[in-house]
Amino acid sequence: MLTYGIDVSANNPEDAPGSMPGMSFVMIKATEGHTYVSPTQKAQATAARRHGRAVGFYHFLWPGNIGLQAHHFVEKCASTPGDILAVDWEQTTDNTHASNAEKD
C-alpha cells in the first residue's frame, strides 16, 4: 500500500494541506538558512491537522554553519510533539549546496 503526501511552503496557499484529497501527510517548510522563517507554517499545519493529516516540518539547508541552522530550525519551527522534523538538502537558488561533510 502506498502512502501519499505533499510538501508545501509559503509559495502555497495556507489551506493547501487540506485542499488535496488522498494525502496522508504534509511536510511544511518552516525555515531556510539561518534567518528565514515561513510566515505560513502555523496556518498550514492547522489546515493539515484539521483534515486529519500527519504533519512534518522541514528546513531548507544552505551551505555553512550547519549548527546555527539546526538551532534556528528547532527554535522557529511550529512543530508539536509527534511531528516529523526533516532537512531538505538540495541545490540552492545560487547553485550551491551543503557538502557531505557539512551534512554529516
What residues fall within each predicted segment?
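Substrate-binding cleft of extracellular glycoside hydrolase catalytic domains
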Residues: 1-104
